[in-house]
């Protein structure tokens, strides 16, 4: 009998949500996602120390500006970790643009192009890279421009249907609805602490996005993310992709049994609607208090971890 991780692979592409090379070797995912929090955790792994030292040395050769050294070393480290991961997987690595740039279209595009250039210098083609951007209006517009340059994007911190719709209309390659954080909010802000699968707001959110995309013929990939437990994951079997932490990959691999495909579209295609304007996007997004709170919170958390990472680098630059 297959374990549930093997069974799940029948319906969804499995992506590892980690920067830990040993975990990637163990679970053999198709793709891998990283973010500032995961890169920060990776700096605590002894096997990465040579990459950190190399990034610092490289940054010092690029300019005489100490502040720029910090930025360059942080970018270089994220890319070098990505390069090591790509040696172990057949697919793509997602590397994130600094969350502090989430509301700056031009700066986000520049940072993305810098990351792609660093990968190119390491002989990694852009087809193996997804640039991660927060799904703000500005992040979506930056992704739209990057996609036209052949740079594929992963729009993250996605909580509202307005975000999902705007991403599809911009032609982005992939979105990452944050499943677990949706439930966190509802548990905190309602009297209901446990939800049946048919009433679960996290499951309903991804189901709505998935079926909307398929119904209107959008090619944007839906990748469920930020899971809290294996039950959440199994409720979305059939989602295009699922990015899963090593701990939950381990749990799935230890569970024996079959998996039922929960997401499948069999309806007729419908015409795409007129794209949202900026004002329509903000109006619709702001009707969802969970999405407003969680998007802002997520950007702050990633920005905080990015600063912690820069501080780690600064100590080595001193």
UniProtKB/Swiss-Prot annotation:
Annotated GO CC locations: cytosol
GO biological process, any: carbohydrate metabolic process
CDD domains in alphabetical order: Transaldolase_TalAB
GO function term, MF aspect, one: transaldolase activity
InterPro entries listed in its UniProt record: Aldolase_TIM, TAL/FSA, Transaldolase_1, Transaldolase_AS
Pathway membership: Carbohydrate degradation; pentose phosphate pathway; D-glyceraldehyde 3-phosphate and beta-D-fructose 6-phosphate from D-ribose 5-phosphate and D-xylulose 5-phosphate (non-oxidative stage): step 2/3
Main location: cytoplasm
EC primary class: transferase
Active-site residues, Swiss-Prot/TrEMBL: 132
Pfam family membership, one: TAL_FSA
Keywords assigned by UniProt, alphabetized: Cytoplasm, Pentose shunt, Schiff base, Transferase
Location within or outside the cell: Cytoplasm
Disulfide bonds: none
EC number: 2.2.1.2
Catalytic activity from the UniProt record: D-sedoheptulose 7-phosphate + D-glyceraldehyde 3-phosphate = D-erythrose 4-phosphate + beta-D-fructose 6-phosphate
Function: Transaldolase is important for the balance of metabolites in the pentose-phosphate pathway.
Name by which UniProt lists this protein: Transaldolase
Record organism: Hamiltonella defensa subsp. Acyrthosiphon pisum (strain 5AT)
Lineage: Bacteria, Pseudomonadati, Pseudomonadota, Gammaproteobacteria, Enterobacterales
Gene transcribed to yield this protein: tal
């Amino acid at each position: 009998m297959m374990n549930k991780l093997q069974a799940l692979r029948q319906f969804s592409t499995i992506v590892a949500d980690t920067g830990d090379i040993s975990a990637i070797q163990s679970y053999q995912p198709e793709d891998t996602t990283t973010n500032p929090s995961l890169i920060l955790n990776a700096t605590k792994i002894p096997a990465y120390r040579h990459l950190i030292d190399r990034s610092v040395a490289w940054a010092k050769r690029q300019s005489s500006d100490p502040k720029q050294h910090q930025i360059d070393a942080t970018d270089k480290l994220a890319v070098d970790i990505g390069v090591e991961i790509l040696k172990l997987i057949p697919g793509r690595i997602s590397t994130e643009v600094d969350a502090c740039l989430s509301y700056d279209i031009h700066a986000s595009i520049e940072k993305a192009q810098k990351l792609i250039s660093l990968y190119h210098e390491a002989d990694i083609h852009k087809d193996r890279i997804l640039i991660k951007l927060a799904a703000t209006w500005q992040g979506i517009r930056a992704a739209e421009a990057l996609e036209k340059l052949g740079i594929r994007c992963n729009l993250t911190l996605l909580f509202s249907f307005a975000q999902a719709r705007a991403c599809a209309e911009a032609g982005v390659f992939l979105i990452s609805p944050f499943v677990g954080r949706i439930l966190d909010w509802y548990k905190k802000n309602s009297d209901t602490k446990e939800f049946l699968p048919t009433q679960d707001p996290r499951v309903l959110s991804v189901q709505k996005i998935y079926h909307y995309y398929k119904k209107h013929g959008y090619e944007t990939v839906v990748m469920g993310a930020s899971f809290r437990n294996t039950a959440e994951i199994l409720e979305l079997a059939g989602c295009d992709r699922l990015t899963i932490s090593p701990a939950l990959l381990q749990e799935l691999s230890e569970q024996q049994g079959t998996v039922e495909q929960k997401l499948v579209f069999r309806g007729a295609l419908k015409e795409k609607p007129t794209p949202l304007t900026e004002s329509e996007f903000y109006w619709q997004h702001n009707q969802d208090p969970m999405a407003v709170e969680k998007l802002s919170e997520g950007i702050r958390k990633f920005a905080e971890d990015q600063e912690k990472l820069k501080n780690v680098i600064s100590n080595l630059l001193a």
